[in-house]
């Protein structure tokens, strides 16, 4: 009898919670004025949602709350500059001072300490557009290698917590979404 591979098993995933949402989020908000932040592209979460994310229907039914931190680039003025990914793309992200402070008080550890490749819950996020020079100064990354555009979207996250502390890396590489815009 021939071996049958179901569509759900044709592409290996490292988490059932990670779904592709970054590219769609950018495309849905591309009509927005790029010089002003778009308001709450990822909805805010309540304290109950953040305290018990495994039991929150708000979190579990919205895939844009799930992300993995792929790399930390810089820490400046209590803001953390990093990149996150979904199941197919990466995007640059800025964790606000309030987000970093709340995360570190809740988890009794630095947000940059052993959280790379952990499954995170994010909320209350805006989409801001930054120039290549601002990205270079904050992220210490040259966007000309990633995107031909002069300004690129960056996710400004105001809420974050850990969903799964296991640091499961992936053998696959995940391109920045900027290549597809």
From Swiss-Prot:
Keywords associated with the record: Chromosome, Nucleus, Telomere
Outcome reported for the amino acid change (mutating residue 114 to A/K): Impairs interaction with the telomerase RNP and causes telomere shortening
The keyword Repeat appears for this protein: no
Impact after mutating residue 82 to E: Causes telomere shortening
Record GO biological process: telomere maintenance via telomerase; viral translational frameshifting
Effect seen on changing residue 166 to R: Impairs interaction with the telomerase RNP and causes telomere shortening
Residues forming coiled coils: none
Role, per record: Component of the telomerase complex involved in telomere replication. Stimulates RNA/DNA heteroduplex unwinding which favors the telomere replication by the telomerase.
Matching Pfam families: TPP1
A GO cellular-component term linked to this record: chromosome, telomeric region
Name under which the protein is recorded: Telomere replication protein EST3
One term of GO molecular function: DNA/RNA helicase activity
Impact upon substituting residue 87 to A: Causes telomere shortening
Effect of residue 3 to A: Causes telomere shortening
Family: Belongs to the EST3 family.
Consequence when changing residue 72 to A: Causes telomere shortening
Record has DNA-binding as a keyword: no
Annotated compartments: Nucleus; Chromosome, Telomere
Tree of life domain: Eukaryota
Main location (coarse class): nucleus
């Amino acid at each position: 009898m021939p071996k049958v591979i179901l569509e759900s098993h044709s592409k290996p995933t490292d988490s059932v919670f990670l779904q592709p949402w970054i590219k769609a989020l950018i495309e849905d908000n591309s009509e927005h004025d790029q010089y002003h932040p778009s308001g709450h592209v990822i909805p805010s979460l309540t304290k109950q949602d953040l305290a018990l994310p495994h039991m929150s229907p708000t979190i579990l039914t919205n895939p844009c709350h799930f992300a993995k931190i792929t790399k930390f680039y810089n820490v400046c003025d209590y803001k953390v500059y990093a990149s996150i990914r979904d199941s197919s793309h990466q995007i640059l992200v800025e964790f606000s001072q309030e987000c970093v402070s709340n995360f570190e008080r809740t988890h009794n550890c630095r947000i940059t300490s052993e959280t790379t490749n952990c499954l995170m819950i994010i909320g209350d996020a805006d989409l801001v557009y930054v120039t290549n020079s601002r990205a270079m100064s904050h992220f210490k990354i040259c966007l000309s290698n990633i995107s031909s555009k002069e300004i690129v979207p960056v996710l400004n996250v105001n809420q974050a917590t850990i969903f799964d502390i296991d640091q499961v890396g992936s053998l696959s590489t995940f391109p920045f979404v900027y290549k597809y815009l």
